[in-house]
A protein has these predicted regions:
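Short, conserved structural patches
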Residues: 45-145
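Alpha-helical assembly-interface signal, strongest on the long, hydrophobic N-terminal helix that forms
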Residues: 1-66
Length: 145
């Protein structure tokens, strides 16, 4: 029986490392799911802001990351597009030519900390399109966002 004493430690090391990997995998899956849900909600909020705020207002892109998602950079991952009546992106949007606003999150990589697996995964693109409303202009003049 004494000769088997080391075997239990080896078994525990193998099984324990697999269980820890499974535990970290569950935690990382929860964090990745939270990140995707937060970015989806942030995209919806930013599209709503884009519909009522002046064209190219910087507060639109910052609204996407309202939950503080780790590793997210609004300047590189958020694209705000102003669309015409046919849904084509406008190169130089003006108040009279914008019919829809579209906010999308692209190329965001979710960092992972699971030992032995990939260090990151790329999230799918989120895009929300809404009809343009006031675009920051009212009867009293322009309004700030």
């Amino acid at each position: 029986m004494k000769k088997m004493h080391g075997l239990y430690m080896v078994e525990f090391a193998i099984v324990g490392s697999l269980l820890m990997m499974l535990l970290f995998g569950c935690l990382e899956f929860g964090l990745a799911t939270f990140s995707l849900a937060a970015l989806n909600e942030g995209t919806r909020r930013a599209a709503r802001l884009a519909a009522v705020c002046p064209l190219n207002d910087p507060k639109i892109t910052s609204a996407v990351n309202f939950m503080g998602v780790y590793g997210f950079n609004a300047s590189t991952n958020v694209l705000v597009s102003y669309l015409d009546a046919n849904g084509t992106a406008l190169a130089a949007p003006t108040i009279g030519t914008v019919y829809y606003v579209q906010v999308s999150v692209q190329n965001y990589t979710i960092p992972l900390a699971i030992p032995g697996l990939s260090d990151s995964i790329t999230s799918p693109s989120f895009a929300v399109t809404l009809p343009a409303e006031s675009l920051g202009v009212s009867n009293a003049g322009s309004t700030a966002c």
